[in-house]
């Protein structure tokens, strides 16, 4: 049984668009299964709703332990920190990267695609869409590259996830995209897109948008994906960046 939650105040007087990084900081400061009564206190406005608050804490790697409570313009959520990764996102992103779900290694290191054999960061560096290795904050702040996953539950293998999780996660990411409006969205791994949108989808620009933003889908960057070479992944990242710059 989880102990009574400690109280944390997050985002006091800040724009709602800054809450994802503030919640990411909270996630990093806690241990798995820590329980928190989180008071979200951003600047009030039409974009601030209980639904958005719930989406943001899920994206930050927490599980709500009850319904949101509204106190004036504040939203209070009792939540539990899970073994996962937080969204690293903000307004004015050039490209939003959407993965499937965190691996235990990535969750342990608090960095997406952290495993040495994963080719995400080498390919992103070679493509020029980032300039620091395995540093999501630097990628966001200096290159407008945001990172999220369809599902926040950490598993050894993606096939441990079910379609309902993909659908729920897809809906959350679509709301996130419609709100923050990145120039384009890049799905890393075809499995999630195929599970929800088009089971016959292939790599490249998709006909369907996400939150009214153009979408590029590319193969997974895992070193186990022997069908895709590093130079192929570099070309995919460059094509996704070009899509963003045309948007």
Model-derived features: positions:
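An N-terminal amphipathic alpha-helical segment
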Residues: 1-37
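Short, hydrophobic/glycine-enriched beta-strand segments
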Residues: 88-100
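Short, surface-exposed acidic-centric catalytic microdomains
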Residues: 3, 7, 110-164
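Short, conserved loop/helix-junction motifs that constitute active-site signature segments
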Residues: 29-30, 89, 177-180, 208-211
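Short N-terminal binding/cap micro-motifs at the start of the first secondary-structure element
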Residues: 104-108
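C-terminal capping/extension of enzyme domains
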Residues: 2-9, 39-51, 60-68, 72-90, ...
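Short, well-ordered beta-to-alpha junction loops that form the rim of enzyme active sites
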Residues: 41-43, 100, 187-192
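Internal catalytic-core helix/loop-beta-alpha segment
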Residues: 145-199
